[in-house]
Amino acid sequence: MANWYMSHEEYAKRIERLLDAAFFHHTQEPIGRAVTRALYGNILENSVTRLERFAACAFSHYLQYGLQLKERELQQFAGVDMGNIYHDALEHFAKRVESSEYTWFTLPADLQAEWVEVSMEDAILGCGNTAVFEEPRNRYLLERVKATLRKTVWALIAQVQKGHFVPSEFEVSFSQADHLDAVNFTLSEQEKMRLRGRIDRVDTYESEDKVYVKIIDYKSGNTSFSLLNIYHGLQLQLVVYLNAALELTAKKYTGKEVEPAGIFYYHIGNPMVDGNGTESEEEIRQAVLEQLKLNGVVNEEREIYRAMDIDFSGNSAVIPVGEKADGSLKASAKTVSTEEFHTMSDYVNRTLVNMGREILNGAVDIKPYQMDNQTGCDYCPYHTVCSFDARIPGFFYRKLEKIDERDVILDRMRQED
């Protein structure tokens, strides 16, 4: 029958298209150097988020940052707006503390509550389009955001007051202007890469001869620290920010050794805790603080992690660390040594350089990653553009190895030097 249709001119072209579709096999070549130079130039100006997108899927990166395709903007209060409001409000609050006569250890509770409200108003005004908040649904969401911000400020202050680390910098912007080795990379004789970004918070603790640095990144989503994701290039931000903060701190404290203390995500939330109604207010507060514990990895030196939570017994409610009765670390503690921090740092730097070179070499493969039940397609808005379908020949996921043992991951990082 196909031969009959092909032999008739009025049907031949349609049949040809049908046969092409039926036996389609996806193939793809990298884009040429002339194209990459036109898109990116010889100096890549990158955010870390952009490189994480490249690690998830090179084609998605190409569409977003090369061709600069954008989703249609709608006049609505979206999750990204909530995240921006949280960040801006926390920045305004921190500036008020820094410019006042108080510290994070002495700020009165009534003033704390007042400044939260004012900082929230400042953040909303900074959004520009305040009309969107007049809608009933958005007014309700805004009240929830305010309640969450109040809980967040309470928790952040409680965490600070449990230790010796002091918030020293907020919304630290770094770029090529800072001439930091941590964010400037040579890809070839003619090509360079410069990273830009903003560190939400840098805390420091100063001993007699050392300064310890802790990074905190505020997240309104459910982002969890993963050493494996660092290994696969999917979660580079905290390590890059730590490298930049260590270099900036070293320039500030020229006579002291600067060491990494920890890298953390703080999940902005307003959790509910289980109980039977007999708990005291203090027990409830401790349970909430436990829910809002920093998520990340801590330096295993006792002097360092104890400076983040001075007098905890058993498990800390501030950091992911617990001690046995003899004072040794529990197996569940999320810790690494100073040397292992350097291992992560060196590995991430090599990964960044390799990614930059791949981008300039024209890598645009439609090969999203897959690891367990997660893929590079999960939150990608470009599926209708790439038409990725693993059932079609030539389309396939890039399978990433699942490694559970931290020591194995760190050994791999050392070996791939």
Locations of regions flagged by a protein language model:
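Structural signature of nuclease core domains in nucleic-acid processing machines
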Residues: 1-417
